[in-house]
């Protein structure tokens, strides 16, 4: 028997009204390479994170920048204050592995593994009293 699906978002586990989430599934980048970039922006303000992603010369930074802009748009849609947003969670989970065979000498073949990622960015509003100077 399957799990009962809850249609009301407020009853889902882990849902908070002051958060905005953006998820990219099956990204064609290794989780290890994506984590290198996501570790840099975790905990930062949204503006600072966007600047960092623009200057980091990695392909994962372009993917994360696009996903962060999507999360910001989701926050704007929910009516959150964009000036108080920070990155609460930025993770790259392992996705499926695409396998293909490359022919080699003497009738052999070697397997090439193309690793995919599921990247999640969660933005949250800073509480009113905890503003930084």
Swiss-Prot record:
GO annotation, cellular component aspect: cytosolic large ribosomal subunit
Organism superkingdom: Bacteria
GO biological process terms held by the UniProt record: translation
Matches recorded under SUPFAM superfamilies: Ribosomal protein L22
HAMAP family: Ribosomal_uL22_B
Assembly, per entry: Part of the 50S ribosomal subunit.
Function: This protein binds specifically to 23S rRNA; its binding is stimulated by other ribosomal proteins, e.g. L4, L17, and L20. It is important during the early stages of 50S assembly. It makes multiple contacts with different domains of the 23S rRNA in the assembled 50S subunit and ribosome.
Name by which UniProt lists this protein: Large ribosomal subunit protein uL22
């Amino acid at each position: 028997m399957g799990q009962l699906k809850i249609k009301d978002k407020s009853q889902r586990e882990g849902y908070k009204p002051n958060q905005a989430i953006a998820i990219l599934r099956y990204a064609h980048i290794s989780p290890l390479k994506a984590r290198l970039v996501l570790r840099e922006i975790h905990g930062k303000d949204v503006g600072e994170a966007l600047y960092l992603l623009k200057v980091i010369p990695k392909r994962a930074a372009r993917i994360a920048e696009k996903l962060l802009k999507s999360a910001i748009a989701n926050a704007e849609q929910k009516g959150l204050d964009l000036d108080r947003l920070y990155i609460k969670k930025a993770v790259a989970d392992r996705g499926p592995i695409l396998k293909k065979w490359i022919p080699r000498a003497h009738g052999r073949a070697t397997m090439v593994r193309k690793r995919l990622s599921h990247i999640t960015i969660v933005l949250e509003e800073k509480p009113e009293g905890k503003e930084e100077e």
